[in-house]
Amino acid sequence: MATIDDRLAELSITLPTPPAPLGNYVGAVTVGNLVFMSGHGTNKPDGSFVVGRVPVDCSQDEAYQAARLVGINMLATLKEQIGDLDRVQRVVKVLGMVSAAPGFENHPAGINGFSDLMVD
């Protein structure tokens, strides 16, 4: 049976070092059998961030890729927290935020970058 690490390799995803929190909080906390994840940003491996409002400063596809990047960062934090991603049974809740220009209404299309990664 393939592992999550195997699947990440198939997708050419290498988990980065988990991004350092930008404030007085931790990236993840385990309570019983649940792991609660703090909000994560669009930290790129070079330390910069994906920024801008959809669709003015970045395209809907760029927002999708940014949400996917957040998912990769969260997986890195989760792996650091629990050691083995195969221990994860289910993603219980996702709260995604999109910086968007007035009138933009297709927020789910961006957040799907995260959701699709979790499904993959």
Question: What are these language model-derived features?
Answer:
Residues 1-120:
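Short, polar/acidic, helix-capping and beta-turn segments at strand->helix junctions
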